[in-house]
C-alpha cells in the first residue's frame, strides 16, 4: 500500500502563478491545485490506485475548465449548457416541446377560436470530443518519487517532469477549450440557413401564399434576387451607414426566439439581457466597430452555471434543470462522478441549489446595439483558431460562374449612337465600331483590363469534335420520322438531253411543289425572333452551326431516280460547307453586309461608273438579244473571239453609246478577253469598266490569301483550298466552256470521291468541232475542250490555263453576278443549231473594190442595217432591233464560226466528299452535289414582255443553282405550269438533277441574303466572299487566327472561386448543449502510457423556427485570376479524329502551339495530357474559359441579366408536377422558355438535345470527356446533374417552408439548415442553373465609360455593346 506524503512545496508553483480576482480564475486555481495535489499524496507501485484517482481527476479537470473557458466566449450566449453523465449510454434521445399558438380575439361573425397547443419532438444530436497525450515511463517514475535519489539534480528532474506534465495537460485543456468553441460554432452553422434564403421564405409565408406553382415561381425569383442583393453586402455597401445598419437589422430579425427561458443569461453591466450573438471574422468585427455600430458596453456579466440531466432510476423521468453552480472541484467530484453520495441525495441537493443565488462573473465583451437588440459581437478567428490546422468555419468559399457574349451583332434598333460626335474615328478612316465585334474587354483580378477575342475559341472549334454528329443523327432517328416535302432534300441522277430537263422536273414534281411546304425557303423569310418561337416546328432540327439537319428520304442512295420513292422519312445531316449557309435568321443579312463593309476597307472597290454600267446591263430589259447569240457562238473560245474582234468592238461601243452600259458582262470569259485584246479599240470610259471588273475579281481572290496562313498541303490540297470554297477545285463554276475545271477536279485525292455525270454519262473530252463534225442532237458524254488557241497536237486531257482562270470564273459568277443581278438572272441552255443558222443568215451588200465601207445605215443602201437589207429572221434585223450599229466587214467575220462550233448544252452533276480539313468518321459518307452547265449562257434581265424578241427559239431556261433561277425567266418559259407561277417567286425551281438545297455547296441563305441585302455592290461582293469561307476545324483555324469573323459568336463561360467572410447570428439560449462524463482511456506502451480523453456531447435546438442565420458579408480575396485562359480540347477531349492523319497532326500542332493550355511534352501513352507548369503565377489560379457556339443574332439583352449559358432555362424549379416536366423544360422547344416566355431558346445550338453544345458538354454522352472538375459548362448541360440540383432546390424550398410553418409531433422537425444550403452558398449558379454577366464591352471605350461611373453610360454604340455586372459581386472592387 502507498503511504501519503506531505506536499512538496514546489508542486503548486504553476497553479500559484494563475491570477485571481474572479470566480472563473478561482475555479481554475482550485482545479490546478487539486490535480497536482494528487502527486503529493500517492507514492506506490500499485498502478490501480494511480489509475483510478488520476483518471478521474484528470477528466474532471479538463471537463470543468473547458466549460469555464467556453462560458467566457460569446458563443455561450446561444447555449444552455447541461451536464448529462449518462450521455454515453443514450441510444436515442428526444425532447418534446409544447408551443402555444397565439390567438387574436375579433368581433363580428368570425368563429370563436379555442387555444391551440402544438407539440414538437426533436431528436438529440450526439457528438464527441477527443484529445490525447502521453507520459513516458521515466517521467512517471519521477512523478511518483521512485526515481528520486535525494540529490538536487533528481529534484530538478522531478520538477521538470511536473512541468512537462503540466504542459501536456494544458495542451489537452486548450484542445478541449478550442474544441468546445469549434464544435458549438459548427452546431450553430449547421442549423443556420443563409440570409438570402430565409428572408424570401419569411416574406413568402408572411404573405399567406400557398405552395402553388405560381407561388413557387415567385419565391424562386425572389430567392435569386435576394441572393444577388444580400451576398457580400458589407463589401458592396462601402461607407453607407444606413444600408449596413438595415442589413444587420435584417440579419438579426430574421430568426425566431428560443422557447427556453433561463433563469440567468448574459447581460451588460446595467443588467440588460443580451439578445444574441453575432460571430464573424476579425476584419469584419473591426470594421463594424469602427464605422457602423455603437458599442453599448465593453463588459458582460456571464453566468457560471450549468444544468444537469437527472435520471431517476424509479421512473426514468427526464428533467431539464438550470442553475447548477460550479464552485469547486469537490462539487464536480460529488455531482458529476457520483463518488460519495447516492442519486437521491444528489437530486435533492440539486433542487435545493436551484433556489440559491446563481453565480456570475464579469468578462471582456463587445456589446453592440443593432436595432432594438443588444448583441454580443464576437470574432473567434484569432482567439480560437490561430496557429491551428483547423480552418475558421466562417471563412468559406463560393464558386460563381460568369457568362460573356462574344462576337454577337446588335439588331437594327440597337445599332445607334447617342451623339453623332462621340467616339468618332480618325479623319479619313471608316468607323470600326460599325463593324461586327470580334473581341470583348473586361476586368480581371486587380482591375486589369483583359481581352477575349474569337481567336481564343480555337481550342474549342478547331477540334474534330466540331464534325462529330453521329450521336445527333442516331438520337434523332430513334423515333419514327414523318415524311416531308423532299424538294431540296433529294438529288436525282441526270438523264436525257438538257433541253427537256426542266420540263420533266416540273411535270414530275408539280404536285409536290404545289401542295408541300418548303422548309428551307420559309426559314429564310423568318426574322430571328420568329425563328426562335416555339411555333417554329423546324427549330428542333437547327442543332449545329456546321451541319444542316433535315427530313430526307429513307433508304435511298443519292443520286436516285427522277422522283423519290414513297416511304418513311429519316433525319439526315449534311455539312454546311461555308458559313454563308447559316440560316439567315441566325446570321442576318445586316451582319453579313457589315462584315463585307469591314473587309472592303483598304481593298479594291469598283468605281461608281463601273457599278452603274454593269448594273444597268443586268437590269436592261432591252438588252440586245443578238448579244446572247454572239456569246453562245463564241462559246468561250479565245480563237473565235479574236476572229470576231471587230464585230465585238462595234457591239460593245454601240451599246455603250446608247445606254452607257457594258455589254457581255454576263460572261467572265468575254470580260477577260475584252481586257486582254481590245484595250485600244474601245472608248476609255468603257474599257475602264471591264478593267475594273477584272481588277475587282483579282482583289476578291487575293482576299482568300489574306485570311489564310501558310502551311503544308493536306490531302493533296493547298491551305487556301481548304479554307475557301472558291479556291476548292471540287466546286465548278455554274457555267463552263472548257474542261479545265473538270480535269482539276478529277485530279483531287481519291478520298474526295469526285464524280461527274454529264447528262447521265461519263465525260469525254473532245478537242474540236466544226460544221462537218457537229452533232447538235448528241446524247452522250462528249464535252468540248478547245476554248484556247493551241497547237494542233495539243493534248485534250489536261487543263490549258492556270488554276486562277477557274477560280476567277467562280468568283465572278458566285460573287459578282449575284451582287449586280440580286438573283434575277437565270442560266439557260443553248439551241446551237438555231443560233448558228440565224447568225449565218445575213444580208451584206457587196462593196466594190476600192470603195470605203459604208458607215451610215440610214442613207447608204450598201450598209447591212439599211432598211432595204432588214429581212426577217436575219441577223441584220436583230442588230437593228437592238440598236446596234455594225458594218459589213464585221458581220462577215461570223463566217469563221463554221470552223469552231459548239454542239449542245450539257448538264453536269458533280459530287464530292468533304475535304481533308473536314473529313471525319461522321462526314466521310456525306456528299455535296453541285450542278453546272457546259456550253450554257446566263440570261440577265427578263425580256418576256418584248414580243419582238423570241429568246425561246434559241435558249431554254435551265436553272443550275438558286442564285441563277430568276422567277421571271423560269415562269415565262414555254409550257410552264400556271399553278406554279406564284410559287416560282418564292421557291427557286432548280431540277433535282442539278442538285438540291441541302446537298449544295451554296444554299438558300446566300440566295436570300442577296435578295435582302441593303449594301452596295462593293460591300456585297466582300460580304459574299466572306460567306464562302468554310466551316471546318482547319478552315476555322485560319479564319480565327487571321481575324475573320466566322459568322457565329460564342457564349464564354468562366467559373471563379472566391474566399468569403461570413457572419453568423444566433438567438439567446437557442441551443441546448449536453456534456457527458469525460472518459480517460489508458494505453500501455513500451515507453510509457498514452492517455486518450473522450467526452460525449449532444445538442438540440430550442426553437420553433430558425434561431440562427448566416450571411456572406464580403469577399476576402479571389482564388482564381478572373482571366481569359481559353479551353483547349486537345488536353483530354476524345472525338473521332480527322481521317487524314497529316491534317490531324497539323491541326493539333497548330492549335496547341498557340494555346496556354497546351499539353506538356512528352504526351503520356495512357490518360490525359498534362498541363505544363509555368515558371510563375501572379494573379491566382487560372480560370478556364469555355466557348459555346452562339448565333450572332442572339439578343445581347439575354446576357444582361442572369441567364443559362445553354440559352434556355433548366432545373425543375420552373417545371410542373407531372412526370417528364423537367425533361420537357430542358429540351421541348415546342414550349416557350419559362424565363423568356416570348421565345423557345436564345441558342438552339446548345439548348436542344443532341445539339453541338449538348454533345460537347453533356457528360451523359461520354463522348468528348466532359468533366465536372475541368469544365464550367458541365453542370449546365448534364441532365443528371441538373436533375440533382433540381431535387436539391426543391427540397430546400419545401423543407425551409415546412420548418418555419406550424409543426406537430408527427415528425421530428429539427430546424436544421435545410439540405441544399451548402450548394446555395458554395455553388449558387449550379443550383439556380444560371450564370452571371460581368461588366464587359466589345469596345474598350464603352468599358472605360462604365469604369468611370458615367451617369448615363450607353450600352450600345452602333455594332458595339456594353454589358453591366449583374452578379452578386456588383459593386465590389476586386
From Swiss-Prot:
Keywords: Capsid protein, Host nucleus, T=16 icosahedral capsid protein, Virion
Compartment annotation: Virion; Host nucleus
Protein name as annotated: Major capsid protein
Subunit structure of this chain's protein: Homomultimer. Makes the hexons and eleven out of twelve pentons. Interacts with triplex proteins 1/TRX1 and 2/TRX2; adjacent capsomers are linked together in groups of three by triplexes, heterotrimeric complexes composed of one molecule of TRX1 and two molecules of TRX2. Interacts with scaffold protein; this interaction allows efficient MCP transport to the host nucleus. Interacts with capsid vertex component 2/CVC2. Interacts with the small capsomere-interacting protein/SCP.
Summary of the function given for this chain in its UniProt record: Self-assembles to form an icosahedral capsid with a T=16 symmetry, about 200 nm in diameter, and consisting of 150 hexons and 12 pentons (total of 162 capsomers). Hexons form the edges and faces of the capsid and are each composed of six MCP molecules. In contrast, one penton is found at each of the 12 vertices. Eleven of the pentons are MCP pentamers, while the last vertex is occupied by the portal complex.
SUPFAM superfamilies to which the protein is assigned, alphabetical: Major capsid protein VP5
HAMAP family per UniProt: HSV_MCP
Gene Ontology molecular function terms on file: structural molecule activity
Organism of origin: Human herpesvirus 1 (strain 17)
GO cellular component terms, semicolon-separated: host cell nucleus; T=16 icosahedral viral capsid
Coiled-coil blocks: none
InterPro entries the record matches: Herpes_MCP, Herpes_MCP_upper_sf
Organism domain of life: Viruses
Any matching Pfam family: Herpes_MCP
Family named by the database record: Belongs to the herpesviridae major capsid protein family.
Amino acid at each position: 500500500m502507498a503511504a501519503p506524503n506531505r506536499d512538496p512545496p514546489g508542486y503548486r508553483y504553476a497553479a500559484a502563478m494563475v491570477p485571481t480576482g474572479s470566480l472563473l480564475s478561482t475555479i481554475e486555481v482550485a482545479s490546478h491545485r487539486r490535480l497536482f495535489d494528487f502527486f503529493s499524496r500517492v507514492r506506490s507501485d500499485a498502478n490501480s490506485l494511480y489509475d483510478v484517482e488520476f483518471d478521474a481527476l484528470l477528466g474532471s479537470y479538463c471537463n470543468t475548465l473547458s466549460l469555464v473557458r467556453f462560458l467566457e466566449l460569446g458563443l455561450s450566449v446561444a447555449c444552455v449548457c447541461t451536464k448529462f453523465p449518462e450521455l454515453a449510454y443514450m441510444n436515442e434521445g428526444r425532447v418534446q416541446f409544447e408551443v402555444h399558438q397565439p390567438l387574436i380575439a375579433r368581433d363580428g361573425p368570425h368563429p370563436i377560436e379555442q387555444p391551440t397547443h402544438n407539440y414538437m419532438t426533436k431528436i438529440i444530436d450526439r457528438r464527441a470530443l477527443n484529445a490525447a497525450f502521453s507520459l513516458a515511463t521515466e517521467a512517471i517514475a519521477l512523478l511518483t518519487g521512485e526515481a528520486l535519489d535525494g540529490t538536487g539534480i533528481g529534484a530538478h528532474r522531478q520538477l521538470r517532469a511536473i512541468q512537462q506534465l503540466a504542459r501536456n495537460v494544458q495542451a489537452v485543456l486548450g484542445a478541449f477549450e478550442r474544441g468546445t468553441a469549434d464544435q458549438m460554432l459548427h452546431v450553430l452553422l449547421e442549423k443556420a440557413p443563409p440570409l438570402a434564403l430565409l428572408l424570401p421564405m419569411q416574406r413568402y409565408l408572411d404573405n399567406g401564399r400557398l405552395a402553388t406553382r405560381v407561388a413557387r415561381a415567385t419565391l424562386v425569383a425572389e430567392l435569386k434576387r435576394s441572393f444577388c442583393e444580400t451576398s457580400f453586402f458589407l463589401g458592396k455597401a462601402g461607407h453607407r451607414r444606413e444600408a449596413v445598419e438595415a442589413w444587420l437589422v435584417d440579419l438579426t430579425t430574421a430568426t425566431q426566439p428560443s422557447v427556453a427561458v433561463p433563469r440567468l443569461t448574459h447581460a451588460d453591466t446595467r443588467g440588460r439581457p443580451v439578445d444574441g450573438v453575432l460571430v464573424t471574422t476579425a476584419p469584419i468585427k473591426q470594421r463594424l466597430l469602427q464605422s457602423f455600430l455603437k458599442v453599448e458596453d465593453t463588459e458582460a456579466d456571464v453566468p457560471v452555471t450549468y444544468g444537469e440531466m437527472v435520471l431517476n432510476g424509479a421512473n426514468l423521468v427526464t428533467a431539464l434543470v438550470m442553475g447548477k453552480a460550479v464552485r469547486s472541484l469537490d462539487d464536480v467530484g460529488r455531482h458529476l462522478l457520483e463518488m460519495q453520495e447516492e442519486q437521491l441525495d444528489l437530486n435533492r441537493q440539486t433542487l435545493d441549489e436551484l433556489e440559491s443565488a446563481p453565480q456570475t462573473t464579469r468578462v471582456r465583451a463587445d456589446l453592440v446595439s443593432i436595432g432594438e437588440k443588444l448583441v454580443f459581437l464576437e470574432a473567434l478567428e484569432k482567439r480560437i483558431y490561430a496557429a491551428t490546422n483547423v480552418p475558421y468555419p466562417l471563412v468559406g468559399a463560393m464558386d460563381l460562374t460568369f457568362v460573356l457574349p462574344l462576337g454577337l451583332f446588335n439588331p437594327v434598333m440597337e445599332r445607334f449612337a447617342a451623339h453623332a460626335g462621340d467616339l468618332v474615328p480618325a479623319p479619313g478612316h471608316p468607323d470600326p465600331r460599325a463593324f461586327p465585334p470580334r473581341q470583348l474587354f473586361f476586368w480581371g483580378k486587380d482591375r486589369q483590363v483583359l481581352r477575349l477575342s474569337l481567336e481564343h475559341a480555337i481550342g474549342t472549334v478547331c477540334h474534330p469534335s466540331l464534325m462529330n454528329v453521329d450521336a445527333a443523327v442516331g438520337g434523332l432517328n430513334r423515333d419514327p420520322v414523318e415524311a416531308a416535302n423532299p424538294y431540296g432534300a433529294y438529288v436525282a441522277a441526270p438523264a436525257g438531253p438538257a433541253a427537256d430537263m426542266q420540263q420533266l422536273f416540273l411535270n414530275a414534281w408539280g404536285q409536290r411543289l404545289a401542295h408541300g411546304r418548303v422548309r428551307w425557303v420559309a426559314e429564310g423569310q423568318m426574322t430571328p425572333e420568329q425563328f426562335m418561337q416555339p411555333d417554329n416546328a423546324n427549330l428542333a432540327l437547327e442543332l449545329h452551326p456546321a451541319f444542316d439537319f433535315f427530313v430526307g428520304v429513307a433508304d435511298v442512295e443519292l443520286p436516285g431516280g427522277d422522283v423519290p420513292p414513297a416511304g418513311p422519312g429519316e433525319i439526315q445531316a449534311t455539312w454546311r460547307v461555308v458559313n454563308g449557309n447559316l440560316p439567315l435568321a441566325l446570321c442576318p443579312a445586316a451582319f453579313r453586309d457589315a462584315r463585307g463593309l469591314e473587309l472592303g476597307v483598304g481593298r479594291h472597290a469598283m468605281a461608281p461608273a463601273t457599278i452603274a454600267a454593269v448594273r444597268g446591263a443586268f437590269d436592261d430589259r432591252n438588252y440586245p438579244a443578238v448579244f446572247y447569240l454572239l456569246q453562245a457562238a463564241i462559246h468561250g473560245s479565245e480563237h473565235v473571239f479574236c476572229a470576231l474582234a471587230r464585230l465585238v468592238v462595234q457591239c460593245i461601243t454601240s451599246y455603250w453609246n446608247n445606254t452607257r452600259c457594258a455589254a457581255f458582262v454576263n460572261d467572265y470569259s468575254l470580260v477577260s478577253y475584252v481586257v486582254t485584246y481590245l484595250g485600244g479599240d474601245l472608248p476609255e470610259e468603257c474599257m475602264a469598266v471591264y478593267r475594273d471588273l477584272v481588277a475587282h475579281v483579282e482583289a476578291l481572290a487575293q482576299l482568300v490569301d489574306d485570311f489564310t496562313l501558310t502551311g503544308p498541303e493536306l490531302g493533296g490540297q493547298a491551305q487556301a483550298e481548304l479554307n475557301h470554297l472558291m479556291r476548292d477545285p471540287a466546286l465548278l463554276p455554274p457555267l463552263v466552256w472548257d474542261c479545265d475545271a473538270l480535269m482539276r477536279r478529277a485530279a483531287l485525292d481519291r478520298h474526295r470521291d469526285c464524280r461527274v455525270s454529264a447528262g447521265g454519262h461519263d465525260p469525254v473530252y473532245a478537242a474540236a468541232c466544226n460544221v462537218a463534225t457537229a452533232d447538235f442532237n448528241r446524247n452522250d458524254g462528249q464535252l468540248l475542250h478547245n476554248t484556247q488557241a493551241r497547237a494542233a497536237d495539243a493534248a485534250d486531257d489536261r487543263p490549258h490555263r492556270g488554276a486562277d482562270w477557274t477560280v476567277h470564273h467562280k468568283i465572278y459568277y458566285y460573287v459578282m453576278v449575284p451582287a449586280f443581278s440580286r438573283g434575277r438572272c437565270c442560266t439557260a441552255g443553248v439551241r446551237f443549231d438555231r443560233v448558228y443558222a440565224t447568225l449565218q443568215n445575213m444580208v451584206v451588200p457587196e462593196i466594190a473594190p476600192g470603195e470605203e465601207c459604208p458607215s451610215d445605215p440610214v442613207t447608204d443602201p450598201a450598209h447591212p442595217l439599211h432598211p432595204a437589207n432588214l429581212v426577217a429572221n436575219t441577223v441584220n434585223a436583230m442588230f437593228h432591233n437592238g440598236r446596234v450599229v455594225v458594218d459589213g466587214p464585221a458581220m462577215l467575220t461570223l463566217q469563221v464560226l463554221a470552223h469552231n462550233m459548239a454542239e449542245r448544252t450539257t448538264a453536269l452533276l458533280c459530287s464530292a466528299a468533304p475535304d481533308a480539313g473536314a473529313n471525319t468518321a461522321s462526314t466521310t459518307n456525306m456528299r455535296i452535289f453541285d450542278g453546272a452547265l457546259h456550253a450554257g449562257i446566263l440570261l440577265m434581265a427578263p425580256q418576256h414582255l418584248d414580243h419582238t424578241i423570241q429568246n425561246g427559239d434559241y435558249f431554254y431556261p435551265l436553272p443550275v443553282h438558286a442564285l441563277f433561277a430568276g422567277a421571271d425567266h423560269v415562269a415565262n418559259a414555254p409550257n410552264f405550269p400556271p399553278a406554279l407561277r406564284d410559287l416560282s417567286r418564292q421557291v427557286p425551281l432548280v431540277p433535282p438533277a442539278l442538285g438540291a438545297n441541302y446537298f449544295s455547296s451554296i444554299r438558300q441563305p446566300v440566295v436570300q441574303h442577296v435578295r435582302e441585302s441593303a449594301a452596295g455592290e462593293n460591300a456585297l461582293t466582300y460580304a459574299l466572299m466572306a460567306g464562302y469561307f468554310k466551316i471546318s476545324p482547319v478552315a476555322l483555324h485560319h479564319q480565327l487566327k487571321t481575324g475573320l469573323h466566322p459568322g457565329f459568336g460564342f457564349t464564354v463561360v468562366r467559373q471563379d472561386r472566391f474566399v468569403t467572410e461570413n457572419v453568423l447570428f444566433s438567438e439567446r439560449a437557442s441551443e441546448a448543449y449536453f456534456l457527458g462524463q469525460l472518459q480517460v482511456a489508458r494505453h500501455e506502451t513500451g515507453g510509457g502510457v498514452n492517455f486518450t480523453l473522450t467526452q460525449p456531447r449532444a445538442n438540440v435546438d430550442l426553437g420553433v423556427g430558425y434561431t440562427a442565420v448566416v450571411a456572406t458579408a464580403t469577399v476576402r480575396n479571389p482564388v482564381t485570376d478572373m482571366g481569359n485562359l481559353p479551353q483547349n480540347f486537345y488536353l483530354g477531349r476524345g472525338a473521332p479524329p480527322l481521317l487524314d492523319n497529316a491534317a490531324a497532326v497539323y491541326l493539333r500542332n497548330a492549335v496547341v502551339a498557340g494555346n496556354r493550355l497546351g499539353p506538356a511534352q512528352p504526351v503520356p501513352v495512357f490518360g490525359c495530357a498534362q498541363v505544363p507548369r509555368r515558371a510563375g503565377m501572379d494573379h491566382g489560379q487560372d480560370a478556364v474559359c469555355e466557348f459555346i457556339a452562339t448565333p450572332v443574332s442572339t439578343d445581347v439583352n439575354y446576357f444582361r441579366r442572369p441567364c443559362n449559358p445553354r440559352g434556355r432555362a433548366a432545373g425543375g424549379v420552373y417545371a410542373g408536377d407531372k412526370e417528364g416536366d423537367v425533361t420537357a423544360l430542358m429540351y421541348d422547344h415546342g414550349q416557350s422558355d419559362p424565363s423568356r416566355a416570348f421565345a423557345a431558346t436564345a441558342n438552339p445550338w446548345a439548348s436542344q438535345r443532341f445539339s453541338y453544345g449538348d454533345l460537347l458538354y453533356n457528360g451523359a454522352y461520354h463522348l468528348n470527356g466532359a468533366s465536372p472538375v475541368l469544365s464550367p459548362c458541365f453542370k449546365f448541360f448534364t441532365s443528371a446533374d441538373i436533375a440533382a440540383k433540381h431535387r436539391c432546390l426543391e427540397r430546400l424550398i419545401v423543407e425551409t417552408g415546412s420548418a418555419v410553418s406550424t409543426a406537430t409531433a408527427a415528425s421530428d422537425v429539427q430546424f436544421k439548415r435545410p439540405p441544399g444550403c451548402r450548394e446555395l452558398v458554395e455553388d449558387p449558379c449550379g443550383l439556380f442553373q444560371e450564370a452571371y454577366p460581368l461588366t464587359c464591352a466589345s469596345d474598350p471605350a464603352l468599358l472605360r465609360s462604365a469604369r468611370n461611373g458615367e451617369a448615363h453610360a450607353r450600352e450600345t454604340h452602333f455594332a458595339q455593346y456594353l454589358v453591366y455586372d449583374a452578379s452578386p459581386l456588383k459593386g465590389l472592387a476586386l
